[in-house]
Amino acid sequence: MKEAVKMSCLCIFLFLFLFSLTDAIKCIKCGESGLFGTEDCVTGNFEAEECGPNDQYCTKIILNDGTRTTAQRGCSVGHVPESNQKDGKVSTHMSSCNTDGCNAN
C-alpha cells in the first residue's frame, strides 16, 4: 500500500513538473534595441519566442512622432493597461495581452 501511495505521489509530481515546463507564454520580441523601438518592429514578420518563467504578459508600444512610426514588443511580468495618447504630433499606444503571440498586431 505504501508503495502505491509513493508511486501516485511521484506521478503527480512528475506531471506537475512537466506541465510547468511548457507553461511559459510566447510573445513577439522586437524593437528592444532602440530607445523608442525600431521601425522594422512595426511591420516586420516575427515569430513568437518563449518568454521567461515569470513573464505572464506580452506587451506592445507604438510611437508615432509625425514623421515615422516605431514599435517595441516583448514580455512583461505585469499587465500594462491599454492606453492611447496624443500630444501634438506625437501619439503613443501601449497595451498588453496574455495569450501566445497576441502582441503581433
From Swiss-Prot:
Renumbered residue ranges of the record's region Disordered: 79-105
Start-end of Polar residues biased regions: 92-105
Top-level taxon: Eukaryota
Compartments, record wording: Secreted
Pfam families, sorted: Toxin_TOLIP (PF00087)
Signal peptide annotation: 1-24
Protein's UniProt keywords contain Membrane: no
Name of this protein: U-scoloptoxin(05)-Sa2a
